């Protein structure tokens, strides 16, 4: 038997004269484009790829690159092996389904965020709860307390009768600066913000475009063109994204600049009848926080513990005399320990999110579960906050009679 060898050779294209011969159908790359790239000095496959956009469409060259390499090799009078290939990218290289689906591996791949007082709270045997990615102290059980209600009731009673401290670092914090910040805030909040005095804080209600409550929180005017906004923990990211959208897309002509500083500041609520006395022990003497100098809803820059810069806000979500003090995060753990030591004579206690919720509800504030994306300002008893003297996001749809119905 005689074996006749086949004379097979690659045929990469038919000379077409002036007609176009397509190589990459997705990016409209032709044989002429590849030859032109070679003529202009692009000999490497990677260079030709970027010069012509060959293989840079959704298939990443899966349907065109072999043909293109053959055309290049033929044009330069060399083999395909000498010409080389581009770097393989998905979906050219098979990917295991497990890489997409994955599997639970405990907490290995779960992102976590810890408050500055986390180590101290752990030392106090705090019970933690996941709030978004944060771990927050839920309550602080003492020896002999066998039920969480015992701990929470004690924390509430002690805070109301003397003083308690709660880590509220997880609240969103946004620094906003610019000549038009007042006008900007007046457009995003349902209540008036155009004339907030310097050194004052105002509670604000923010609505979505459909009139449903998005978030609530306080915003302090630190100077003429500098405001500090706080948001709820759960909505810190969504509110910041909302503000960016409002500025960039709705009112780009306003002079407004903002940045999230949630992780840059540790913040503690100091609440109770003795809260001012406790703070006076750590606030530097030149900073007057008396009732006359620092009244309700005041805000200002202070120094503590011999010159450490801090921010102080006289706001209360507990129904008692209360303050919130913010300090650079690196001092957060130390400040918690200093506050607890300074408050020993007042029998200061730490309180967690459960006691915070109890006191917030008893005062009549909206609690976290009520801001669930389904409630209106009227559902929360805040219909009176909606200004009728200005336009703002959610104004028109927020006044629908259906949202004001008492039996919703």
Q: Where are the regions that the model predicts?
A:
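Conserved, structured C-terminal
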Residues: 114-123, 136, 223-408
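Cofactor-binding beta-sheet edge motifs in enzyme active sites
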Residues: 9-29, 35, 57, 134-136, ...
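Acidic, proline/glycine-enriched N-terminal capping motif
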Residues: 51, 67, 71-207, 212
């Amino acid at each position: 038997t005689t074996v006749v060898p086949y004379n097979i050779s690659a045929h990469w294209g038919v000379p077409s004269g002036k007609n176009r011969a397509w190589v990459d159908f997705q990016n409209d790359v032709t044989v002429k484009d590849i030859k032109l790239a070679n003529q202009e000095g692009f000999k490497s496959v990677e260079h030709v790829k970027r010069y012509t956009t060959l293989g840079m469409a959704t298939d990443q060259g899966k349907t065109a690159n072999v043909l293109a390499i053959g055309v290049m090799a033929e044009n330069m009078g060399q083999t395909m092996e000498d010409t080389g290939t581009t770097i393989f990218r998905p979906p050219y290289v098979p990917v295991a389904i497990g890489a997409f689906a994955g599997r639970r591996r405990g907490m290995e791949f779960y992102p976590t965020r810890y408050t500055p007082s986390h180590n101290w709270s752990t030392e106090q045997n705090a019970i933690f709860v996941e709030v978004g990615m944060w771990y927050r102290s839920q309550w602080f059980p003492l020896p002999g307390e066998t039920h969480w209600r015992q701990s929470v009731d004690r924390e509430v009673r002690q805070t109301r009768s003397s003083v308690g401290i709660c880590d509220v670092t997880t609240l969103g914090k946004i620094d906003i600066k610019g000549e038009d910040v007042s006008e900007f805030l007046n457009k995003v909040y349902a209540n008036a913000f155009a004339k907030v005095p310097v050194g004052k804080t105002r509670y604000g209600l923010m609505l979505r475009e459909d009139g449903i409550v998005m978030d609530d929180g306080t915003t302090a005017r630190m100077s003429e063109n500098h405001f500090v906004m706080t948001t709820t923990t759960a909505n810190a990211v969504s509110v910041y994204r909302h503000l960016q959208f409002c500025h960039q897309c709705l009112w780009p002509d306003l002079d407004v600049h903002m940045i999230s500083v949630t992780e840059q500041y540790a913040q503690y609520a100091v609440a109770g009848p003795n809260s001012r006395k406790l703070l006076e022990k750590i606030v530097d003497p030149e900073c007057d926080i008396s009732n006359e100098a620092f009244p309700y809803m005041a805000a200002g820059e202070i120094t503590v513990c011999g010159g450490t810069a801090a921010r102080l806000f006289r706001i209360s979500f507990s129904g008692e005399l209360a303050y919130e003090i913010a300090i650079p995060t690196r001092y957060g753990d130390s400040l918690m320990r200093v506050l607890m030591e300074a408050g020993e004579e007042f029998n200061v206690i730490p309180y967690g999110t459960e006691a915070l919720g109890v006191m917030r509800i008893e005062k009549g504030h909206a609690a976290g579960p009520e801001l669930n994306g389904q409630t209106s300002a009227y559902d929360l008893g805040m219909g009176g906050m909606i200004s009728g003297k200005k336009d703002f996001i959610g104004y028109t749809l927020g006044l629908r009679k259906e949202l004001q119905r008492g039996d919703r």
